[in-house]
Amino acid sequence: DMVSRGLGDVYKRQILIDVGAEYGNYSSDMTRTIPVSGKFSSRQKLVYQSVLNVKNKTEKLLIKGNSIRDLNSNVGEIMTEELVKLGLLKIKDIKNQNPKAPLYKKYFMHGISHHIGLDTHDYGFIEKKIEPNMVFTIEPGIYIPDEGFGVRLEDVYLVNQNSLPTNLMKSIPIEIEEIEEIMNS
């Protein structure tokens, strides 16, 4: 029993796993957040689902002609919407925010994507237009220090000519139910 051993608080936590692999001189990158107990708390589920929503909406923006800068600009609005739903931001504060210091950055302080290829964080200009056959990550996160946890999810995508990108990690579990099932099997 983890509580009787003084580990009750640890039992409520999550583990954020950011891993990569190399094959044929090319790199990969993936992040998942999993509950130590095998079950997410109700609050963790809400935050996890918000991060997954941001990832899924951002995926639709990873298309030919956009740039990483475009993705970062658009994800600010998507993230802000989710943070309002979670009660972390208030609409009245958003209306008065400094555009050079958006409020969502308190909870999501890194970029949404990076190039991937010969290196995990491969070299590439954020202004360069995205072209078919380029490979990028999408990695939103929400980090809530006051609540003692955060969630980040990351997959790798191949940009296509005339369609949405291909998630190269689509067979790796990411949905809440999938993660809990694996953790409890």
Model-derived features with residue positions:
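Short glycine/threonine-rich loop-to-helix capping motif typified by GTGT followed
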Residues: R5, E82-L86, G124-F125
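A short glycine-/small-residue-rich loop at the edge of a beta-strand within enzyme catalytic domains
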Residues: P35-G38, S42-Q49, L62-D70, L103, ...
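Charged, cofactor-coupling segments
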Residues: Q14-N56, I112-S185
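Extended C-terminal subregions enriched in glycine
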Residues: V47-K90
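Single conserved hydrophobic/aromatic residue that forms the stacking wall/gate
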Residues: D1-Y11
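Active/binding-pocket-proximal capping segment
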Residues: S73-T80, K92-N96, M134-F136, I174
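Short beta-strand/loop turn elements enriched in aromatics
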Residues: K95-Y123
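A glycine-biased, small/acidic residue-tolerant capping/turn segment at secondary-structure junctions
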Residues: L88-K95, V151-L153
